[in-house]
Every structure is written in structure tokens, then in C-alpha cells.
Regions:
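Cullin-RING E3 adaptor/co-adaptor recruitment helices
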Residues: 1-78, 93-137
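Amphipathic alpha-helical repeat scaffolds of TPR domains
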Residues: 79-86, 91
Length: 140
């Protein structure tokens, strides 16, 4: 009966913490057997929150990349539009606006790839926390 109570209490505390981070939970009021589980749940919650922010950034960058690609296509078709960018601007010389927008799209793509890598690392860390929680609940 005590173990079942601990699981239910842990689930309730975790739910409250995840729904509203401002709810104060005092370590002295939490049984020591549950404190580590709460820390793990909160870490998992933080990872998921960060992952959501990364998803939003990736989505915005994909939209910007698409705009850059469209501008590149538009300007490549109009060969009369030419300009030069100084060497110190992004370290890139362009013969026309199409090349410039292609360059912008490639930079955005590299940022998206970096964010995707970070999301993969977060997913792996989440899996570890979930395994840790699974092992804890199996013990209880």
C-alpha cells in the first residue's frame, strides 16, 4: 500500500510541477525515495521544453530558407539585376542577387542542420531519463 501511495503521490507532484513551475515544492516535504524521481521528471520536462523551442526555431528557419530560395530563383531569371557585395560582407562576393540569396539559403540550411543535431542529442538524453524513470517505477 505504501509503494502504491508513493507512486500516486509522485505522479501528482510531477503533474503539478510540470503544469505550473511556480508551485513551491519543499525538499523537506518530499520523501527521500521520491526526490530523485522528481528531479528526473523535472529534467525531462526541461528537455522537452527546450526541444519545443528548437522545433519552433527550425520551423522559422525553414520558412526563411524557402523565402531565400524563391528570391534566388526570381533573381536568377532576371539576369539584368547585377550588383557587387564587398568582401567584408559575409565574406562573399556575388555577381547577382540570385547568388546572394543562394548563399543565404545555404547558411540557413547549416543552422537548421546544427539545430537538428541538438534535437537528436536531446532525444537521446530524454531516452536516458525515461529509462531511469522506468527502472524506478519497476522497483516501487
Amino acid at each position: 500500500m505504501t509503494k502504491m501511495f508513493q507512486v500516486k503521490t509522485l505522479q501528482a507532484l510531477a503533474a503539478c510541477t510540470i503544469i505550473n513551475e511556480s508551485i513551491p515544492i519543499f525538499p523537506s516535504s518530499i520523501p527521500s525515495t521520491m526526490f530523485e524521481e522528481l528531479q528526473t521528471l523535472y529534467s525531462l520536462f526541461c528537455l522537452r521544453k527546450h526541444e519545443k523551442v528548437l522545433d519552433e526555431k527550425v520551423d522559422r528557419l525553414k520558412v526563411e530558407r524557402q523565402k531565400a530560395i524563391e528570391k534566388s530563383d526570381d533573381y536568377h531569371m532576371d539576369s539584368s539585376v547585377l550588383f557587387a557585395i564587398n568582401d567584408y560582407v559575409a565574406g562573399f562576393d556575388a555577381e547577382n542577387l540570385g547568388d546572394y540569396w543562394e548563399h543565404c539559403a545555404s547558411i540557413i540550411t547549416s543552422h537548421i542542420e546544427k539545430l537538428e543535431e541538438e534535437k537528436q542529442e536531446i532525444s537521446q538524453e530524454e531516452a536516458l531519463y525515461l529509462c531511469k524513470l522506468g527502472n524506478t517505477y519497476n522497483k516501487i
